[in-house]
Amino acid sequence: MAARNKARKRAFQILFEADQRGESVQSVLADWVRLSRTDDRQPPVGEFTMELVEGYAQYADRIDDLIVTYAVDWEIDRMPVVDRSILRLGAYELIWMDGTPDAVVIDEAVQLAKEFSTDDSPSFVNGLLARFKDLKPNLRREQ
């Protein structure tokens, strides 16, 4: 598994855990970093994972607003936690990071949905992130 793929998976797991525990993503990230330094069985939390989590945290409210606006007939709190976490991560990387092609960001999010969520989730994630990709220039300006 490529390093960035692993980093995205870890970032997703941190967002998921924070949502499940009702804690901030920064707090859960700090727990993961601390644990990786004290437990040899835990892999280190890489720089790209930290960049994704911290970046999401910076735009969390805006990202949730976008999901609510464009996820037709879905309330964010009724959405499966897995899907919500994948969408949050994908939206941040897609809209605010420029280092990865949009198609790769969307594909990686779809792969996470295939691995961790329901049979319907990959197409839902793909559709919503594709919509964000199409609107990306406007979404960045509306910050």
From Swiss-Prot:
Molecular-function GO term, any one: RNA binding
Stored InterPro entries: NusB-like_sf, NusB_fam, NusB_RsmB_TIM44
Single GO cellular component term: cytosol
GO biological process entries: DNA-templated transcription termination; transcription antitermination
Pfam families in the cross-refs: NusB (PF01029)
Record keywords: RNA-binding, Transcription, Transcription antitermination, Transcription regulation
Keyword tRNA processing: no
Family label: Belongs to the NusB family.
Function per UniProt: Involved in transcription antitermination. Required for transcription of ribosomal RNA (rRNA) genes. Binds specifically to the boxA antiterminator sequence of the ribosomal RNA (rrn) operons.
Protein name: Transcription antitermination protein NusB
